């Protein structure tokens, strides 16, 4: 699931990138780590936060998924936004079936794609990469110190009234993922969205690392699912820095990591003084 989310974001077109330019700044890189630490401690000290997040997800996830299907995902078409309605209905009407669980997971993953594209558009690439690694470190610390499990159980158990679907976490068969686990994957996809080949390699790396990482479930009950994404990022960056990995942009050009940051993200540079 995470690998698919990594492969889905596409870069904003120049018009929208220019519109969002005024919002661009390093501070947005705090969002990944703040999202996991903030949610866990908010639920820990105010359990009603879980109920509020349940209703927030109920409203926001289908809308964000529709945006991904109609605009910000690879292969997006405006009419595909209607697919989100169908996925929501399947999730709602068949909540305990594999079809319902799969539809819910797709909605959550697609909603994260929208968030990943938008956040990567307003955050300098190098800072967002640091944010991904910081999120994985925070996730690992919370699990190792047993501070994540209890609040997470409260969040997973929270249900909206009226039999409406739970969209704040993902359950597919025996696999459970938190929303943040898909969010971090979307951030990785957003980082490389302008370099299709690198993005695809990052998705494959995420799948490979996660498959090996999951073997640890043989000896432990809880694992930070953000870690495989961060490791995939680090491996990709090592390949880019060593010149062994080069990616094509949407216009077909190739660039090394430093060239790409300098050339395709000129807004990161300090503008010349006004005269």
Question: Can you describe what each PLM-predicted range is?
Answer:
Residues 1-275:
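A membrane-topology feature that recognizes alpha-helical transmembrane segments
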């Amino acid at each position: 699931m995470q690998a698919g989310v990594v492969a889905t974001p596409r870069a904003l077109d120049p018009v929208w990138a220019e519109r969002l330019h005024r919002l661009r700044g390093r501070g947005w890189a705090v969002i990944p780590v703040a999202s996991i630490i903030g949610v866990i401690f908010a639920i820990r000290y105010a359990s009603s936060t879980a109920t509020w997040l349940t209703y927030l997800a109920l409203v926001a996830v289908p809308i964000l998924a529709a945006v991904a299907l109609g605009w910000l995902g690879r292969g997006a078409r405006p009419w595909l936004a209607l697919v989100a309605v169908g996925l929501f209905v399947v999730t709602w009407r068949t909540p305990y079936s594999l079809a319902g669980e799969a539809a819910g997971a797709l909605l959550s993953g697609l909603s994260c794609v929208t968030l990943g594209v938008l956040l990567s558009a307003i955050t300098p690439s190098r800072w967002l990469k640091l944010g991904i690694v910081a999120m994985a470190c925070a996730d690992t610390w919370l699990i190792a110190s047993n501070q994540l499990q209890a609040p997470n159980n409260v969040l997973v158990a929270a249900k909206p009234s009226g039999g409406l679907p739970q969209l704040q976490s993902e359950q597919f068969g025996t696999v459970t993922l938190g929303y943040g686990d898909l969010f971090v994957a979307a951030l990785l996809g957003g980082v490389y969205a302008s370099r299709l080949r690198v993005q695809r390699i990052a998705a494959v790396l995420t799948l490979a690392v996660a498959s090996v990482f999951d073997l640890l479930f043989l000896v432990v009950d809880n694992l930070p699912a953000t870690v495989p994404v961060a490791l995939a990022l680090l491996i990709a960056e090592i390949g880019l820095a060593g010149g062994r990995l080069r990616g094509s942009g949407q216009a077909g050009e190739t660039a090394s990591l430093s060239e790409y940051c300098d050339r395709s993200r000129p807004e990161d540079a300090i503008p010349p003084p006004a005269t």
